[in-house]
């Protein structure tokens, strides 16, 4: 192999110049923004359908400003486009960070990226299709003849976005636990021993992450977190078992 060929393939342990990193980051950001913009425009025709679907538990929305309905549509289209473009965005993130990784690290990072998206999508879907409708119906039941709900479309969508995003994040718990166990910073025995303390922390976290102040929404978030915590213990035991088998 001649010198030119060797120079065209830098070694993995050679540092990548800062300007090259910045150029690559700029390129990946542009690709991500283009993907989000394209997906936002593509899903815009479905915005009215989603608004009608969201309105089922409440009947009808109101808007209190001349531009509220207009901007709400664009806001919803953006978040729908962001979710639809998430695989592309995650691929761009992966393409950027994989340049400095060894082959074994690339494989692990690729798996983490895919699992992270699947868990976030599961949490977001769980919130949108189950938690939000049930929670809203429960909260509206506290109305009366002298307390009639008049729900602003922008405030309602902010509530839904908060719930969906929060549930997407908390569903990452098994992955976070597995990552800490993999690094040797956590053990399954510790997780089992500290279960009672973890339950208290989970309810505090649910209260902090839930957009609404009501206890019902907080409990709805805490229950899946408890299940995910137990799933994290199982993941931790699997990682420890594999580590022992590999010596």
Stretch-by-stretch model annotation:
Residues 1-247:
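Membrane topogenic/interface segments and analogous intrinsically disordered interaction regions
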């Amino acid at each position: 192999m001649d010198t030119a060929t060797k120079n065209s393939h830098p070694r993995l342990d050679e540092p990548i110049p800062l300007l090259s990193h910045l150029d690559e980051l700029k390129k990946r950001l542009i690709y991500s923004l283009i993907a989000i913009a394209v997906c936002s425009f593509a899903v815009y025709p479905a915005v009215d359908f989603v608004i009608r679907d969201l309105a089922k538990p409440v009947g009808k929305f109101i808007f209190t400003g001349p531009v509220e309905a207009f901007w709400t549509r664009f806001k919803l289209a953006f978040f729908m486009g962001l979710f639809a473009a998430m695989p592309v965005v995650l691929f761009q993130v992966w393409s950027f960070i994989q340049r400095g990784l060894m082959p074994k690290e690339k494989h692990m990072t690729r798996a983490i990226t895919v699992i992270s998206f699947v868990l976030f999508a599961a949490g977001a879907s769980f919130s949108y299709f189950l938690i939000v409708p049930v929670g809203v119906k429960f909260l509206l039941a506290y109305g009366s003849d002298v307390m009639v709900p008049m729900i602003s479309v922008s405030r309602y969508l902010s509530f839904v976005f908060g719930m969906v995003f929060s549930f997407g994040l908390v569903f990452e718990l098994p992955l976070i636990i597995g990552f800490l166990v993999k690094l040797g910073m956590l053990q399954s025995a510790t997780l089992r021993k500290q279960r009672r303390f973890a339950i208290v922390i989970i309810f505090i976290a649910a209260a902090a992450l839930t957009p609404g102040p009501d206890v019902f929404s907080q409990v709805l978030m805490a229950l899946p977190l408890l299940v995910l915590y137990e799933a994290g213990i199982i993941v931790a035991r699997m990682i420890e078992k594999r580590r022992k088998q590999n010596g």
